[in-house]
Amino acid sequence: MPRNEIRPLVKLRSTAGTGYTYITRKNRRNDPDRLVLRKYDPVVRRHVDFREER
């Protein structure tokens, strides 16, 4: 199988509404739903939830 089918690149967008994004890889077999990670948003200078964007 090609590399991009199992672990595609996904964009994580800040829920604080700043437009700041992280890019990461996701394993579709282990995480079929949308990812939600708590990461640092430098625009608001605090940790917020980042949700997977499709």
From Swiss-Prot:
InterPro entries: Ribosomal_bL33, Ribosomal_bL33_CS, Ribosomal_bL33_sf, Ribosomal_zn-bd. One of its GO terms (cellular component) is cytosolic large ribosomal subunit. Signal peptide: none annotated. GO terms for biological process: translation. One of its GO terms (molecular function) is structural constituent of ribosome. Coiled coil: none annotated. Disulfide bonds: none annotated. It holds the Pfam family Ribosomal_L33. Keywords: Ribonucleoprotein, Ribosomal protein. Belongs to the bacterial ribosomal protein bL33 family. This is Large ribosomal subunit protein bL33B.
